[in-house]
């Protein structure tokens, strides 16, 4: 019966109930079929795990029961819950598959992990797919802009994790031409964090911004274009050869 259900609706393995349990977690907690024999329970587990791998590999898309960019931060989308479940279960193969395949197709899952302040999960994601740190959305926000949104739970430690991974996040601008610090100052940082935590975040952002400015000041000046053109002319580079002769 379990196999029949999952053949018709494979994504059900990732569906989360009101107790924040997916089918496998529910079975583990409540003993699967109490009337079923151990051998039968073992078969059920294998069937569920088979379909979990299908979801993790991207062969079966997760149908969200909630909007991914949630307005109420108490709600978490099913795709992120499933990712957290794979992490908690310690299934490295499925976790790696899910991160490699699904996060390329659905960047919002990574953003939501950051906004939900899932630090261990974010570190794991970045260890398997470092390119996630370079993601930007349609508004030009990088992951640091997103971490500072007014509903985000990302604390100072999460901000530090992101900046340690890619310090240049601090100077990248969105389509409003705002760096993350400017974005936070304009829109008020997160309203779900304490003032003390926001002050910590501001201090970290300012430190990284100061370091970025200091680093830029030590870089050599760009070459003078006119001087480069003059040198090229002397060397015959503008003609594609040596001493003005074509090759």
Curated annotation (Swiss-Prot):
Residue ranges of the TM segments: none
Key words, A-Z: ANK repeat, Repeat
Pfam families: Ank_2 (PF12796)
InterPro entries recorded: Ankyrin_rpt, Ankyrin_rpt-contain_sf
Keyword Repeat assigned: yes
Superkingdom in the source lineage: Bacteria
ANK repeat segments: 105-135, 139-171
Name used for this protein in its record: Putative ankyrin repeat protein RBE_1110
């Amino acid at each position: 019966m379990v196999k029949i259900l999952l053949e018709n609706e494979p994504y059900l393995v990732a569906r989360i109930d009101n107790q924040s349990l997916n089918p496998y977690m529910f079975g583990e907690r409540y003993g699967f079929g109490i009337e079923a024999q151990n051998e039968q329970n073992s078969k059920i587990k294998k069937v569920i795990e088979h379909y979990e791998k299908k979801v993790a590999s991207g062969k079966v898309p997760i149908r969200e029961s909630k909007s991914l960019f949630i307005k109420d931060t108490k709600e978490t989308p099913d795709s992120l819950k499933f990712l957290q479940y794979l992490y908690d279960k310690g299934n490295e193969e499925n976790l790696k598959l899910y991160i490699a395949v699904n996060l390329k197709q659905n960047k919002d899952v990574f953003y939501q992990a950051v906004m939900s302040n899932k630090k261990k999960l974010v570190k794991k994601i970045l260890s398997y797919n470092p390119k996630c740190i370079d993601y930007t959305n349609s508004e030009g926000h990088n992951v640091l802009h997103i971490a500072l949104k007014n509903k985000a739970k990302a604390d100072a430690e999460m901000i530090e994790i992101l900046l340690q991974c890619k310090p240049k996040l601090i100077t990248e601008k969105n389509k409003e031409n705002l760096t993350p610090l400017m974005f936070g100052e304009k829109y008020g940082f997160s309203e779900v964090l304490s003032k003390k935590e926001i002050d910590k975040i501001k201090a970290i952002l300012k430190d990284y911004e100061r370091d970025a400015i200091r680093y830029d000041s030590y870089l050599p000046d760009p070459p003078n274009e006119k001087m480069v053109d003059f040198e090229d002319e002397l060397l015959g580079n503008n003609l594609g050869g040596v001493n003005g002769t074509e090759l």
